[in-house]
Amino acid sequence: MAKLHDYYKDEVVKKLMTEFNYNSVMQVPRVEKITLNMGVGEAIADKKLLDNAAADLAAFSRQKPLSTKARKFVACFKIRQGYPIGCKVTLRGERMWEFFERLITIAVPRIRDFRGLSAKSFDGRGNYSMGVREQIIFPEIDYDKVDRVRGLDITITTTAKSDEEGRALLAAFDFPFRK
């Protein structure tokens, strides 16, 4: 079991129960899933780029990515409906906790010119979204084998009812918010 999951059950739940005066342990917000999305717009011209992006995503998520397809026809981007234009992974359970731990402790501190993550990236329902400009912040990616530096979107979905609860949940994990 991931250390962060044990830390959540032992420490974070108690802290949030006293902070928000919850009556039951089930009211305490928890991390439900983490979604990683990598859009590869250049995949229209070269399908190999999508395969390389999927391989990178599989390397640091430790799960096979799902190919995402275009929903609409967009003439100026030369995209037709159904074209594969990206890949995504939804992490839950043990893999989610392992990835979350690696994200906080290893990957985020390796971001170039890192000064903390914005605390304003909540969606109004306690879910947090962030963008990463380079996939090479993850140690599983071999820098010499990278054909192109790509970014990705990371969405942390929680059961929190408000942004305040979501922020308190992530802050309890020592999430590196900007001060």
From Swiss-Prot:
- N6-acetyllysine PTM positions: 3
Provide the alphabetized UniProt keywords: Acetylation, Ribonucleoprotein, Ribosomal protein, RNA-binding, rRNA-binding, tRNA-binding
The protein's superkingdom reads: Bacteria
Q: What is this protein called?
A: Large ribosomal subunit protein uL5
What InterPro entries does this protein's entry cite?
Ribosomal_uL5, Ribosomal_uL5_bac-type, Ribosomal_uL5_C, Ribosomal_uL5_dom_sf, Ribosomal_uL5_N
Stored Gene3D superfamilies? 3.30.1440.10
Name one process (GO BP) from the record. Answer: translation
UniProt lists the family membership as follows: Belongs to the universal ribosomal protein uL5 family.
- State how it assembles: Part of the 50S ribosomal subunit; part of the 5S rRNA/L5/L18/L25 subcomplex. Contacts the 5S rRNA and the P site tRNA. Forms a bridge to the 30S subunit in the 70S ribosome.
* Molecular function via GO: rRNA binding; structural constituent of ribosome; tRNA binding
Q: What does this protein do?
A: This is one of the proteins that bind and probably mediate the attachment of the 5S RNA into the large ribosomal subunit, where it forms part of the central protuberance. In the 70S ribosome it contacts protein S13 of the 30S subunit (bridge B1b), connecting the 2 subunits; this bridge is implicated in subunit movement. Contacts the P site tRNA; the 5S rRNA and some of its associated proteins might help stabilize positioning of ribosome-bound tRNAs.
| Matches recorded under SUPFAM superfamilies | RL5-like
| GO cellular component assignments | ribonucleoprotein complex; ribosome
